[in-house]
């Protein structure tokens, strides 16, 4: 699915709720503004996709909830690749396809997702350790020393892989906002200098992803930042 959230698209979306939304419900976020360009117009609340089982019943419930939320005035949708072992992103992708059939365009919706936690794939039925070795270690996407706390990585090759997987799961070619997910997970595992080096390398990759059009903005999703 082409394109991304745009100022024109999000304003068109907000205009549908001109008489029903509370004053100030839609606004221009400073953090998603580029000098000289109009900012997107986003709802004051969004819908997240964190909890639930990675099964078809939950998939359908999430898809229906996202469609209902967007039809009700919410145009910010958040996820992460590890949420429900990639199924939350896929449920968003299904919702986007359904909404397109209902006349709601991709450029009206602001999508954010995250990468950093190493996650299995709910669509894979084999051993998770074998999956990890096949998908990440053997191809050289991850080295053992890249992994912190047994669950987290933010090396450029890993983030590139995760972003590409997220784009496929979502069925889009650009994510509006991409977060490094809880990078502080690594703070107690590696020296501070090494942590900062890893974070700089992650940002360098994310800058390249902006340049190639795979993401629009990036940042950190952190509890302890």
Predicted ranges, named:
Residues 135-225:
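Glycine/proline-rich, positively charged
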Residues 1-131, 205, 211:
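N-terminal binding-site loop/beta-alpha segment at the start of enzyme catalytic domains
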């Amino acid at each position: 699915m082409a394109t991304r959230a745009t100022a024109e698209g999000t304003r068109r979306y907000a205009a549908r709720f001109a008489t029903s939304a509370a004053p100030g419900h839609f606004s221009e976020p400073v953090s998603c503004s580029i000098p000289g360009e109009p900012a997107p117009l986003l709802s004051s609340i969004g819908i997240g996709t964190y909890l639930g089982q990675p099964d078809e019943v939950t998939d359908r419930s999430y898809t229906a909830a996202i469609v209902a939320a967007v039809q009700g005035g919410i145009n910010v949708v958040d996820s992460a690749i590890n949420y429900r072992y990639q199924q939350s992103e896929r449920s968003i992708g299904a919702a986007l396809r359904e909404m397109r059939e209902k006349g709601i365009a991709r450029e009206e919706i602001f999508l954010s997702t995250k990468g950093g936690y190493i996650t299995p794939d709910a669509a894979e039925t084999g051993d998770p350790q074998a999956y990890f070795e096949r998908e990440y270690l053997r191809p050289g996407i991850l080295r053992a020393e890249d992994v912190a706390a047994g669950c987290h990585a933010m090396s450029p090759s890993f983030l590139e892989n995760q972003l590409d997987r997220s784009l496929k799961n979502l069925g889009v070619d650009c994510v509006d906002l991409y977060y490094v997910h809880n990078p502080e997970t690594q703070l107690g595992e590696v020296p501070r200098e090494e942590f900062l080096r890893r974070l700089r390398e992650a940002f360098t990759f994310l800058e390249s992803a902006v340049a190639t059009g795979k993401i629009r903005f990036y940042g950190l999703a952190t509890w302890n930042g």
